[in-house]
């Protein structure tokens, strides 16, 4: 008989909700465990089967930790600002707030149907003014400390969408959404000075229990490099420009310089003969994003300005070019090119027939750039020195002659924080007619997003908020001075930078969260989510956390102690699930056909949590069959408990496999090896089917071990075993090391290396006892009859080999 999952799952979900089973208390006597999921963006499409994979993993840990006596914080919320809702509003004329609310209600229903043990009283929503009041408060603090500032920056402007796009949203000069042309244009934007935290963001990675690959991605993104700034004079002008280089030792090999096309000097130094070519080039590259411009595989392009720089080391004239692979936003927007020892410079020099001068011995520079180490040559006072010595000496020379200085540079840029969007947190700043700006006073927060019937791009580069005159225009009540509110909104990253803090104290209207509660719950013990957030979200959240630490709001330097990325669930054909491919699996359908417990079990059993694995209906059916077997072992056809389940039996049936199961499942859950833990649960059930009687204590222990993965069926079986309370807070099973030892082992007996018999012997039998048992075995006696035994080799617990001829 199979169990009725629809009935059982609804029954227990109702029970948990009515009894607030998973409400987190501030119980001081217990150890704490904070299990966090990356909260979802509530899209119109609803939950897909990829979401529950990470959610089930944290839920298993949360449920186990409760049973181990921990006070567990396991919350859920919504990252609900963002582009898709705004795009929907633009397309349909509907309010993004209503659309978002509808989607959240659907997501919440779906998540509840999967039986996760969230404390729903702590739900947060980034679009709730009571939440974003504190997002705005953090912004004001950043502004107070000089970490939020306005700057004119070249941005990816998309005229059709009427907005600025992030680099990641531009592909081949077109918007990722809709494929509209994108151009680069300078605009005033809000920036956050994340670079002020670059060193700490780098160094503190060492203390975190994170996958090495994610740490490495963050290190590369921050991109710390040591070198020197070198100042170049422009020949015939009183202008200079600075380049940052990690190889100041190769300065004698510099044969040309390259400026970013946006560099302010370009206009001043371009000669009349080159003006037309330079302007044509600037027009040509207008639609390329930074990512495309720096693509190593792309053909190099560039144009000569007609001007020359003076090499400070030897007075030689270097032609100044512009090329799109040099970015104004990286380093100083200018490079010195040493083509003999840099692949990119070499390629450029070959293409445009520029000189190549070797200054480090080694390689064949007629064929390719030599990037290895060697003695310096053609380098005056550096000749004969190696890289390290030459670098040190050149920096000393530059500093002594006022031509440069030692410098640390970062790949990390300040964070472009404004979006020309309606559906985001308003930035609480007022711009006055006299050119000054002031923050909105703290007591006036939240600055609420105004309701509007018409969300359309302003077309001026401002957000749709610029169209709402009665909201934008303000008058200073004290002076009568007129002003306009900031019309840009914050990016979707803002709300997700600190949501894990709000869960700790979600209803506090006096402060972001109570310091005592933060002290108690931080840092997050396990954070599980997709690897696509490896760099930006995690870096931004760490930056805000460190800032909040500096101003005394949070007690820890880092937010997330342990991080884990689950893999992706692919379609049955091994392709990424997508609506266009028609291979999306909807969890609602699975909950209906197989049940939430089956879905949870299957997703944890598919393979290692970090692996990307194809969905398989056969695998799903297999998971359901296992749960049916479990049910049949406990429950008779008539719904009564199996009479084989007895209290205090006079036997040690199942003793060893039970203790092995408790040990393995506990260790595997802790280490997130859910697939091998489930295999062990299956081993136990197989053994139990062979047993003549089933000791009740072991069967209860099994149900407890199963409960974090399949909570509904576990609650039902717990009730069948005679308990009236939820299983959620029952004590986690313990194992006895002594019971894990096998009393008997099977050994093989070989004659001349061939297996002739197998014997069950006591696990602690000595060599002498094994020899004796082997020689007394009837089959072996037959084999060696009439032969002389030359040697007997006994390996306790394994084998006996008899050499006879």
From Swiss-Prot:
HAMAP family noted in UniProt: Leu_tRNA_synth_B (MF_00049_B)
'HIGH' region, short sequence motif: residues: 40-51
UniProt xrefs under PROSITE patterns: AA_TRNA_LIGASE_I (PS00178)
Keyword Ligase: yes
PANTHER family: LEUCINE--TRNA LIGASE, MITOCHONDRIAL, LEUCYL-TRNA SYNTHETASE
Alphabetic keyword roster: Aminoacyl-tRNA synthetase, ATP-binding, Cytoplasm, Ligase, Nucleotide-binding, Protein biosynthesis
Lineage of the species this protein comes from: Bacteria, Bacillati, Bacillota, Bacilli, Bacillales
Chief location: cytoplasm
Disulphide-bonded residues: none
UniProt keyword Ligase, yes or no: yes
Gene Ontology cellular-component terms listed: cytosol
Residue numbers covered by motif 'KMSKS' region: 576-580
GO process terms (BP): leucyl-tRNA aminoacylation
An MF annotation (GO) of this entry: ATP binding
EC number(s) per entry: 6.1.1.4
Gene: leuS
Alphabetized InterPro entries for the sequence: aa-tRNA-synth_I_CS (IPR001412), aa-tRNA-synth_Ia (IPR002300), Leu-tRNA-ligase (IPR002302), Leu_tRNA-synth_edit (IPR025709), M/V/L/I-tRNA-synth_anticd-bd (IPR013155), Methionyl/Leucyl_tRNA_Synth (IPR015413), Rossmann-like_a/b/a_fold (IPR014729), tRNAsynth_Ia_anticodon-bd (IPR009080)
Name used for this protein in its record: Leucine--tRNA ligase
Family note: Belongs to the class-I aminoacyl-tRNA synthetase family.
Reaction equation(s) it catalyzes: tRNA(Leu) + L-leucine + ATP = L-leucyl-tRNA(Leu) + AMP + diphosphate
CDD domains: Anticodon_Ia_Leu_BEm, LeuRS_core
Domain of life of the source: Bacteria
Residues annotated as binding ATP: 579
Cellular compartments annotated: Cytoplasm
